[in-house]
Amino acid sequence: MQLYLVLLLISYLLTPIGASILGRCVVAKKLYDGGLNYFEGYSLENWVCLAYFESKFNPSAVYENSRDGSTGFGLFQIRDNEWCDHGKNLCSVSCTALLNPNLKDTIECAKKIVKGKQGMGAWPVWSRNCQLSDILDRWLDGCEL
């Protein structure tokens, strides 16, 4: 619990002034510009859906997973025990870099994760909420890319 509070304080202090929850179309545009549309065969709609269900489009979100003790960082709630510098650091990135609203490090790390054998299934929330959804198109409604 103390670690969580420290991480929350650090993320608050490192979050740029004016950073806030991003709009759906802003997220879609940043992910599109970052090359995620059909990356490894997953449509942009899948990525936007994942971002919503993981963080509600909050690039500075930090949530502790009480089941495994890991902490998720940023838009896609990338876990510290595997992917950033609090654990194995398979993305070669600091966990706090995943909180940047420009999403550059988040997108690059997500690309490494999805290249793994689980694909987007590495995010259980995607499997539950997005994978078999027949309304994925709604995530891009009204967005200009």
From Swiss-Prot:
The keyword Signal applies. Keywords: Cell projection, Cilium, Cytoplasmic vesicle, Disulfide bond, Fertilization, Flagellum, Secreted, Signal. It comes from the Eukaryota. SMART domains: LYZ1. SUPFAM superfamilies: Lysozyme-like (SSF53955). Pfam families: Lys. GO terms for biological process: fertilization; fusion of sperm to egg plasma membrane involved in single fertilization. It is found in: Secreted; Cytoplasmic vesicle, Secretory vesicle, Acrosome; Cell projection, Cilium, Flagellum. GO terms for cellular component: acrosomal vesicle; extracellular space; sperm flagellum. Coiled coil: none annotated. Disulfide bonds join 25-143, 49-130, 84-95, 91-109. InterPro entries: Glyco_hydro_22, Glyco_hydro_22_CS, Glyco_hydro_22_lys, Lysozyme-like_dom_sf. Its main location: secreted. Residues 1-19 form the signal peptide. Residues 20-145 form the C-type lysozyme domain. The active site is at residue 54. Expressed in the brain, lung, ovary, uterus and testis. In testis expressed in the germinal epithelium and on the maturing spermatozoa (at protein level). Belongs to the glycosyl hydrolase 22 family. May be involved in fertilization. Has no detectable bacteriolytic and lysozyme activities in vitro. PANTHER family: LYSOZYME C (PTHR11407), LYSOZYME-LIKE PROTEIN 4 (PTHR11407:SF21). Monomer. This is Lysozyme-like protein 4.
